[in-house]
Design a protein with these regions (language model features):
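N-terminal mitochondrial targeting presequence
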Residues: 1-20
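Mobile "lid/hinge" segments at catalytic clefts and subdomain interfaces of large enzymes
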Residues: 18-23, 177-298
Length: 298
């Protein structure tokens, strides 16, 4: 990773600052997830669960309440009731992070309740070239970047300064891990799902829910299974898979669904290819995409 993450050392801060209380990146608590899964199974009548259901239900704050009366009928949950979920991590881009942080500041908390990060990339516009565009952004957006860094330092949020890289690549390389439930304030946040987590794009109000550990509510998605078999022909890439799917489903065909990929064909695709497929799932309106672990995820 060639980007630069700012912790204690100030870059654009308006004060000297102190040691940042930065949450470490963390792997999911797999033992706890498995324990909760064992509690969930009787609530759904012992029916087989899809991968996306396992990932969601193991993050329920109170499975006995949210799955009460569901039994083995999946239609009583999917698209029919709201799930109250605990979030593992939050990522915010610079344009949408401003209002989320301003709202968080009114909550009286000393730091973010979950590991979180802010990434300065959306306010850097392309005109001439990388260096010239970066310098122009530093000049025109200086106050915004100073506010974001100062707030991040105060509330224990990791700050990725201008020039660090694009939020989706940074999250994929540094924070995504199989089993996580992540939110991000960008519609293409599902890019991180390429490493086996569930990453979902949200608005600023939902980001504040995550920052304050307020139960995040999601209408239980329906599940759209995509069976991949064989391998891609020469000159084809993972992007062609999602482009074909988008052609079949159109721009709203995935609305309210998690697209869950399975089959031997997954073993032939790189993790970056899976990330591309999940990223572009936003173009069909999908909540996110889910992939089982493959060796390509490392």
């Amino acid at each position: 990773m060639h980007g630069v993450r700012v912790g204690a050392r100030a870059c654009f801060a308006t004060h000297a600052g102190s040691e940042a209380r930065v949450h470490p990146s963390r792997m999911p608590r797999y033992a706890e997830l498995l324990e909760q899964l064992s509690q969930v199974r009787p609530l759904v009548g012992g029916r087989p669960l899809t991968l996306s259901e396992k990932l969601l239900y193991t993050h329920l704050l109170d499975p006995a309440v949210d799955l009460a009366g569901a039994g083995a009928d999946a239609s009583k949950v999917r698209g029919a009731r709201y799930l109250r979920l605990g979030i593992d991590r939050l990522a915010m881009q610079d344009a949408s992070a401003q209002m989320a942080l301003l709202q968080f500041m009114t909550c009286g908390m000393s730091q973010s309740a979950v590991p979180a990060s802010v990434h300065c990339d959306h306010l850097i516009q392309a005109f001439e070239g990388a260096q010239a565009d970066l310098e122009r952004s530093l000049d025109t957006q200086r106050e915004v970047f100073a506010f974001l860094e100062s707030a991040c330092q105060k509330y224990g949020i990791e700050f990725w300064r201008p020039g660090s890289g694009i939020i989706h690549q940074i999250v994929l390389e540094n924070y995504a891990a199989p089993g996580l439930l992540m939110l991000g304030t960008d519609s293409h946040t599902p890019n991180a799902s390429g490493l086996g987590c569930l990453a979902i794009g949200v608005g600023g109000a939902d980001a504040v829910d995550a920052l304050t550990a307020t139960p995040w509510e999601l209408l239980a998605p329906k599940v759209l299974g995509v069976h991949l078999h064989g391998k891609l022909s020469p000159w084809c890439s993972a992007k062609d898979v999602i482009l074909h799917l988008a052609g079949e489903l159109t721009v709203r065909g995935g609305t309210g669904y998690i697209v869950e990929y399975f089959g031997a064909g997954l073993q032939t695709l790189p993790a970056t290819g899976l990330a591309t497929m999940s990223n572009m799932g936003a173009e069909i309106g999908a909540t996110t995409s889910a992939f089982p672990y493959t060796p390509a995820m490392g």
